[in-house]
């Protein structure tokens, strides 16, 4: 009985360690809250940011067009 309890505790501890490691990776994963959009006269697809007046920093956006009250931001 003691060996089974010890083995159960070891498995439980290992599961906690692996779950915590996955959470650390998830914190640093890139995540955008944008939908695809298209602007006339611009090739490709942009990112539609809802209820924003400007494009957010840190994503490499270089141009945009307004689709009131939203903005469509282009990375190239």
From Swiss-Prot:
Q: Write out the function statement from the record.
A: Blocks Kv3 voltage-gated potassium channels. Reduces blood pressure.
Q: Which tissues is this chain's protein expressed in?
A: Experimental results show no expression in the ectodermal tissue from the distal and proximal tentacles, body wall, and oral disk. Since paralogs are expressed in this tissue, an expression of this toxin in this tissue is probable. The negative results could be explained by the very low abundance of EST sequences.
Does this entry carry the keyword tRNA-binding?
no
Q: Which residues form the propeptide?
A: 20-33
Q: Which residues form the signal peptide?
A: 1-19
Which parts of the chain are coiled coil?
none
Name of a matching Pfam family: Defensin_4
The GO terms this record gives for MF are:
ion channel inhibitor activity; potassium channel regulator activity; toxin activity
Cysteine pairings via disulfide bonds: 37-72, 39-65, 55-73
GO-annotated biological processes: regulation of blood pressure
Keywords, A to Z?
Disulfide bond, Hypotensive agent, Ion channel impairing toxin, Nematocyst, Potassium channel impairing toxin, Secreted, Signal, Toxin, Voltage-gated potassium channel impairing toxin
Tell me the compartments it is located in. Answer: Secreted; Nematocyst
Could you tell me what this protein is called? Kappa-actitoxin-Avd4o
Tell me which species this is from: Anemonia viridis (Snakelocks anemone)
Please give the GO cellular component terms listed in this UniProt entry.
extracellular region; nematocyst
Gene3D superfamilies according to UniProt: Anthopleurin-A (2.20.20.10)
Which family does this protein fall into? Belongs to the sea anemone type 3 (BDS) potassium channel toxin family.
